[in-house]
């Protein structure tokens, strides 16, 4: 029985193809019960690697059935056929994903970015409060509804945090996500605190929102990692970003995990509060080199050498950020990263997975 027939029997009239990944495909469909269009992700167990089926897929389905938040894509129904095809019926992001939106519209005004980022941060806090981590936060996984509200999607690498006998979160050893959004500790294959990893990815996302470009050039991972570990963040001068916005990004892109912000600190940050009548001017910054700044506004920053890379790393016509999944026993990333280049559709859940533990 083909997909259209299976779905028709369940009350869904199949529409267009939305995307296809290594182990999943996504179609639009009209729900006769809900009376509106939905997205249907279809995964065939027989065509999917064992590690994905046994580890990542059950986690994703468990978490999709658990989460319920206004800024997270809704899951309406999950069912499976006798021949091993899984159908996940989800809310449809009718305006596409955030990356395509920014590539079309350019950098967002801070007021627009503030609204969207507050929605995203609220969704992440909801997950973290449930001890759920996403581990693949990126613009492609942020869908937009008809009113351009953020909807977090793709929980393919998500997991529930494990805790030891003292209640402390056990470090993760599955080094997953996309290289351009991955924290330094993940790039180095250092066991990491998964909630803190999500925060770094949030920093990259906010930078893209307000700058319209990537904060780091991931075409050279070694060089990118060196720049990140020096806590160097360049902001395009032409964007005239406020002091508070730069400060929030800088604190999220903190290579020292003990100093990186937590989600509650992000939500309480001054930049995410309702704007004051008179916004803080960014004119008090003293810049050096290619947009790197020295703070005169009580920012937690430090001066450094002139950057040897240029800011304003363009967003490509197609997103091909390397997907990382490194086995538990791998050592350092630089020589052993299992890098797979692909254009990942914003609806398609995690693919190309390797052996992993937590």
UniProtKB/Swiss-Prot annotation:
Keywords attached to this entry: ATP-binding, Cytoplasm, Cytoskeleton, Developmental protein, Differentiation, Kinase, Magnesium, Metal-binding, Nucleotide-binding, Phosphoprotein, Serine/threonine-protein kinase, Spermatogenesis, Transferase, Ubl conjugation
UniProt keyword Ion transport present: no
Family: Belongs to the protein kinase superfamily. CAMK Ser/Thr protein kinase family.
Highest rank taxon of the organism: Eukaryota
Something else known: TSSK1B might be used as a target for male contraception or and intra-vaginal spermicides.
Taxonomic placement: Eukaryota, Metazoa, Chordata, Craniata, Vertebrata
Gene symbol of the encoding locus: TSSK2
Cofactor: Mg(2+)
Domain spans labelled Protein kinase: 12-272
Tissue: Testis-specific. Present in mature spermatozoa (at protein level).
Subunit structure as annotated in this protein's UniProt entry: Interacts with TSSK1B. Interacts with HSP90; this interaction stabilizes TSSK2.
Protein name: Testis-specific serine/threonine-protein kinase 2
Basic and acidic residues: compositionally biased ranges: 302-315, 329-349
InterPro entries in UniProt: Kinase-like_dom_sf (IPR011009), Prot_kinase_dom (IPR000719), Protein_kinase_ATP_BS (IPR017441), Ser/Thr_kinase_AS (IPR008271)
Catalytic activity: L-seryl-[protein] + ATP = O-phospho-L-seryl-[protein] + ADP + H(+); L-threonyl-[protein] + ATP = O-phospho-L-threonyl-[protein] + ADP + H(+)
Role: Testis-specific serine/threonine-protein kinase required during spermatid development. Phosphorylates TSKS at 'Ser-288' and SPAG16. Involved in the late stages of spermatogenesis, during the reconstruction of the cytoplasm. During spermatogenesis, required for the transformation of a ring-shaped structure around the base of the flagellum originating from the chromatoid body.
PANTHER family: MAP/MICROTUBULE AFFINITY-REGULATING KINASE (PTHR24346), TESTIS-SPECIFIC SERINE_THREONINE-PROTEIN KINASE 1 (PTHR24346:SF102)
Keyword Cytoplasm: yes
Active-site feature positions: 136 (proton acceptor)
An annotated GO cellular component: centriole
Activity regulation: Activated by phosphorylation on Thr-174, potentially by autophosphorylation.
Binding site for ATP: 18-26, 41
EC number: 2.7.11.1
Region described as Disordered: spans on this chain: 302-358
